């Protein structure tokens, strides 16, 4: 009697979070995204989520006063609130963008065809042809993560250019609410135009190829293992799935 072959599960869709997790450790992605062994939240994550909700509510006109957690960007938030009230085409707050394999727009819950999912904190117009995408950050700015920051901004830019045909250029950025700084800083913005679309598509195809074709998900020991929920020494807390 032939034994039944159990197909090897692979990653069939991705987000920037999944991509960055895979770069750090393929096994970590498998355990979280395929095996669905969820890591418990922590205080920093809970605080970050709460502040994101404060930003969303204020921009959307809920409440009169600016929450103190947002005070370092007070002028920015007041302008965003006013622009949101005008319902300008292209401005979104806490939005979900989804694409198929060939980068056609689709629905987030199109489980059969959606391959790329992107969460947007805020996107607003600088002028009629320029869109600024902002990702609100809490906590520290880490210069050593420059490569990852740029990759994230490139993904935002590609998605925005594909979704909004009237937009000619996109300026994506990270805004650190606890520090009052943006990355890139004012005057040194990353600017993407419609001519960048083919290049960005090729970049992301190359970057995600290994992840989407992986059938082994080998662990990748690194300096972050000691903090990983799945580390061998964390069995008592529900981890321990990794030998390292």
Protein language model regions, located:
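Catalytic cores of nuclease domains that cleave nucleic-acid phosphodiester backbones
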Residues: 54-141, 165-173
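Nuclease catalytic cores
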Residues: 12-63, 94-95, 227
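Short alpha-helix boundary/capping segments
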Residues: 42-43, 144-151
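Short amphipathic alpha-helical face segments that pack within enzyme cores
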Residues: 50, 151-159
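An acidic intrinsically disordered interaction segment
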Residues: 11-24, 113-125, 193-198
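Short amphipathic alpha-helical segments and their helix-coil junctions
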Residues: 5-10, 27-39, 133-137, 204-212
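Metal-dependent nuclease catalytic regions and adjoining charged, substrate-binding loops involved
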Residues: 9, 13-14, 100, 104-105, ...
């Amino acid at each position: 009697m032939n034994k039944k072959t159990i197909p090897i599960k692979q990653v069939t869709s991705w987000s920037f979070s999944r991509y960055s997790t895979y770069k750090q450790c393929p096994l970590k992605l498998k355990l979280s995204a395929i095996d669905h062994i969820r890591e418990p939240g922590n205080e920093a994550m809970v605080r970050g989520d709460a502040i994101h909700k404060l930003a969303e509510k204020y921009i959307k006109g809920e409440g009169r006063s600016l929450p103190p957690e947002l005070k370092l960007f007070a002028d920015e938030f007041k302008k965003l609130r006013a622009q949101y009230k005008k319902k300008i085409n292209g401005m979104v707050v806490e939005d979900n963008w989804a694409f198929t394999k060939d980068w056609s727009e689709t629905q987030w819950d199109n489980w059969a065809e959606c391959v790329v999912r992107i969460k947007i904190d805020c996107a607003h117009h600088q002028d009629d042809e320029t869109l600024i995408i902002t990702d609100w950050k809490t906590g520290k700015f880490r210069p050593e993560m420059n490569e990852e920051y740029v990759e994230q901004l490139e993904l935002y830019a590609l998605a925005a250019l594909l979704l909004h045909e009237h937009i000619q250029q996109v300026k994506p950025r990270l805004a650190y609410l606890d520090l009052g700084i943006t990355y890139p800083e004012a005057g040194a913005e990353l600017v993407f135009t419609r001519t960048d679309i083919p290049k960005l598509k090729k970049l992301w195809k190359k970057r995600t190829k290994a992840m989407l074709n992986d059938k082994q998900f080998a662990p990748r020991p690194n300096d972050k293992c000691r903090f990983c929920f799945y580390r061998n020494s964390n069995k008592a807390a529900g981890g321990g799935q990794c030998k390292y």
